[in-house]
Amino acid sequence: MSDKKLVNVTLVKSTIGRLPAHKACVAGLGLRKMHQTVAVIDTPENRGMINKVSYLLKVEEA
């Protein structure tokens, strides 16, 4: 996995009251709690989920 480009994603806003599809995107990225940070591989699929819920996230290049 070291040769793959990673992106650090942090959940900074709550998913309470959000659309079910947006909650699913957050879960798909591996985020469960606020202020939790995960490193995800930079793929078009993950970028699509990040773009869909970008208003809930903080994204940094790893």
From Swiss-Prot:
Alphabetized SUPFAM superfamilies for the sequence: Ribosomal protein L30p/L7e (SSF55129)
Gene Ontology BP terms: translation
Keyword Ribonucleoprotein among UniProt keywords: yes
Gene Ontology MF, one: structural constituent of ribosome
GO cellular component, one term: cytosolic large ribosomal subunit
Pfam families from the UniProt entry: Ribosomal_L30
Keyword Ribosomal protein part of the UniProt annotation: yes
Family of this protein: Belongs to the universal ribosomal protein uL30 family.
Subunit structure: Part of the 50S ribosomal subunit.
HAMAP family named in the record: Ribosomal_uL30_B
Name assigned to this protein: Large ribosomal subunit protein uL30
Gene transcribed to yield this protein: rpmD
